[in-house]
UniProtKB/Swiss-Prot annotation:
It catalyses: Couples ATP hydrolysis with the unwinding of duplex DNA at the replication fork by translocating in the 5'-3' direction. This creates two antiparallel DNA single strands (ssDNA). The leading ssDNA polymer is the template for DNA polymerase III holoenzyme which synthesizes a continuous strand; ATP + H2O = ADP + phosphate + H(+). This is ATP-dependent DNA helicase DinG. A motif (DEAH box) lies at residues 134-137, 247-250. ATP binds at residues 56-63. The gene is dinG. The keyword NADP does not apply. [4Fe-4S] cluster binds at residues 123, 192, 202. Keywords: 4Fe-4S, ATP-binding, DNA-binding, Helicase, Hydrolase, Iron, Iron-sulfur, Isomerase, Metal-binding, Nucleotide-binding. GO terms for biological process: DNA repair; SOS response.
């Protein structure tokens, strides 16, 4: 049961909220979501499995709901609350708006912090080494001789660090730090960690101390996945001590799959292995040769197996088997016998080399800690060995996945070879799981103190089934499911118009039909957004309509012609000055674009956003479903299109008093068997269907 003190704290928050915000009106759906989150975390639905999956439509106020339902419970039970998001925009909203507001209304003290990965911080010792007056020392840390402007920038950064005016966070430096500069000073787990006394004052170590003390932590999905891939509790708090709120949860499956994937070049890897071959003697000397000799021998032996093998694999690749995109995918993830054999050898050799280099790295670290070697030499050696450790870790992951035997149950791995665009004659080996749900369940859901997954779009075709399968949540395992409709009056404030068209989007002449049809639905409109399925089609239509736009004094703004920020600013300025403004955009404009009020009155969607399985992972997934007797179009394409279409129409109504219309120029929503399910999953617009 939910403790009376937690109930009291939540009630007090609501009372204080009324005092803090003018015209605050409690929303029934938000109140219900708060109560369900609190009851789920308290174990009222299941004592051990404390999970809620909630789709909360636009306007409900889900972020305030999970703060109200989650923070009082977490603090009362001495747990951390970790909020994971997919976008920087939501992180900024939470840090700069929602959490400061909650801090004012919550009757008790609590602290919150934005967590970032180690690579967002500089290492003080690397920064000092780069600024050293010894030119030889400077240059050895750079792949190319540094520019004077780069060294001047580094010296300013060092001074700001020493003066306490910069915390070492890349994002907080007032100007953009060039990508050629940042890797020289970036913290890494091998050479910059709190185990070395001289690094305990480095920016990441300090940030980690603050994170350990914080009650509420904001992170992104990538950092969350990085932590659980390491076993949990390494970068972020232990899962058993953490209540997770996964906002924008519909992005989690892709992020999780990307983190479980791996890629490595063949000849490129052989090249850096040769460099390791040349430098390992120097590292072994610093590690104390007597102790390091056997590890050095093991590294040399395994490198000398890897280098010719990787080159031989590259030479054995048949260039005639690649698609026009430079990709060859192994059907059903099955490798030819010769490559399967080489994969096993590469897996074993890279694993042994990694273990042995790790031992040498640890020996150098110990000697540095005991002041047995010069700090400058030790730091430089750790940085160098750290780079090779990271490369070997990746190499071992790639070949371990390539060598993994076929499972009796479940989806196979997607495996493919890609031409290296940066190095002619070289190839990149790539491996990715098709399904990551089991891994998420094993590493996160089964260990978490509680988990709340929310988004405005989680269901496909009005069901949670597709999302649950993606993230490893089983609908019969006592998880609490909620689908809360938006409070907006769609029926009276918005129309969904489906014009009678003669062609479907896949027809050859459909682009010509768009050019002919669009002006009818742009005429007389002040603020329009037209969403296309491809850049090619968008640009073709834009080019054909420019003369008409000029004649009618429409301002036509096309995605990609200028930065997103400038394009949207021009659109907003046009709307404010009363000039008809038309935005042309592709898929990225269908999510996360906020154009409330007079900034959008007319949304035109040129086609149902079906994705064609073109990537190796998508092709492999479709192939697997077919092999199981399923239908990839109905099991993947239609659910994905449903989610994307909901996101697209969601651009129109952003606030309670917004009004406008959606025009869908795709007749398939009327005349195909899946059309009704897609249509019924949309918000309850007033429908104007021009088909008899």
């Amino acid at each position: 049961m939910l403790h009376s003190q937690i109930k009291s704290d939540i009630k007090q928050c609501y009372e204080n909220l009324g005092n803090q915000l003018d015209n605050f009106i409690p929303r029934r759906a938000q109140n219900y979501l708060v109560a369900e989150i609190a009851k789920t975390l308290a174990g009222e639905y299941h004592q051990k499995h404390r999970m809620l999956v909630g789709e909360a439509g636009t306007g409900i106020g889900k972020s305030l709901a999970y703060l109200l339902g989650g923070i009082p419970f977490a603090l009362f039970n001495n747990k951390k609350l970790l909020i994971s998001t997919a976008t920087v925009a939501l992180q900024e909203q939470l840090i700069n708006k929602d959490l400061p507001l909650f801090n004012r209304i919550y009757p008790k003290e609590f602290s919150f912090i934005l967590a970032k990965g180690r690579q967002r911080y500089c290492c003080n010792h690397k920064l000092e080494a780069c600024c050293a007056t010894n030119n030889d020392q400077q240059v050895t840390l750079w792949e190319e001789k540094p520019k004077k402007s780069d060294l001047d920038l580094l010296r300013r950064m060092l001074k700001a660090t020493r003066d306490g005016k910069w915390d070492g966070d890349r994002d907080s430096w007032p100007t953009t730090i060039p990508d050629r500069v940042w890797p020289q000073i970036m913290a890494d787990k091998h050479s910059c960690h709190a185990g070395l006394p001289q690094h305990r004052s480095c920016p990441f170590a300090k940030a980690r101390e603050h994170l350990d003390k914080a009650d509420v932590i904001i992170a992104n999905h990538a950092l969350l996945m990085a932590d659980i891939e390491l076993g949990g509790g390494v970068i972020l708090p232990e899962p058993e001590q953490t209540i997770y709120v996964i906002d924008e949860a519909h992005h989690l499956p892709k992020v999780a799959r990307d983190f479980s994937s791996a890629a490595s070049s063949l000849k490129g890897a052989a090249t850096w292995l040769e460099k390791l071959n040349q430098t390992i003697g120097k590292l072994a000397e610093l590690a104390e040769y007597k102790k390091a000799a056997r590890f050095q021998d093991a590294i040399l032996e395994n490198i000398q197996h890897l280098i010719p093998t990787l080159r031989q694999v590259a030479n054995n690749v048949d260039v005639g088997m690649f698609s026009k995109d430079g990709i060859y995918r192994f059907e059903h993830g099955e490798l030819p016998a010769w490559l399967e054999q080489e994969a096993k050898g590469c897996k074993d050799a890279s694993k042994k080399a990694l273990q042995s280099l790790g031992k040498i790295h640890d020996l150098i670290s110990e000697r540095l800690k005991d002041n047995e070697i010069q700090q400058r030499l030790g730091e430089q050696a750790l940085a160098e060995s750290g780079v090779y450790l990271q490369r070997l870790e990746n190499l071992e992951k790639v070949w371990a996945l390539m060598a993994q035997p076929k499972k009796d149950k479940g989806a196979p791995l997607a495996r493919w070879i890609e031409k290296n665009p940066d190095n002619e004659g070289d190839y990149i080996i790539q491996v990715s799981p098709l399904e990551v749900g089991y891994r998420l369940d094993q590493l996160l859901w089964s260990r978490a103190a509680g988990a709340i997954l929310v988004s405005a779009t989680l269901r496909a075709l009005n069901q949670f089934t597709y999302f649950c399968r993606q993230v490893g949540i089983y609908e019969m395992d006592s998880t609490r499911f909620l689908a809360l409709a938006s409070p907006f009056d769609y029926q009276n404030n918005a129309r969904l118009v489906i014009p009678a068209l003669s062609l479907e989007p896949q027809a050859d002449k459909f682009t010509d039909l768009l050019i002919k049809t669009l002006p009818e639905y742009l005429e007389g409109e002040t603020a329009s957004l037209v969403l296309f399925s491809s850049y090619w089609q968008m640009n073709k239509v834009a080019d054909e309509l420019r003369p008409l736009a000029k004649k009618n004094k429409w301002e036509l703004l096309v995605q990609g012609e200028e930065s997103r920020h400038i394009t949207l600013k021009k659109h907003k300025d046009n709307c404010k000055s009363g000039k008809p403004s038309i935005l042309f955009g592709t898929g990225s404009f269908s999510e996360g674009l906020d154009l409330p009020g007079d900034l959008l009155k007319n949304l035109i969607i040129t086609k149902i956003p079906f994705g064609v399985p073109t990537s190796p992972v998508e092709e492999a997934h479709a192939e697997y479903i077919e092999s199981c007797g399923g239908n990839p179009f109905m099991q993947i394409s239609v659910p994905e299109a449903s989610k994307k279409l909901i996101q697209s129409v969601g651009r129109l109504i952003r606030k309670e008093d917004d009004m406008g219309r959606v025009v869908l120029l795709d007749r398939r929503i009327i005349n195909r068997r899946y059309g009704k399910a897609l249509l019924d999953s949309l918000p309850p617009f007033k429908r104007v269907i021009e088909y008899s």
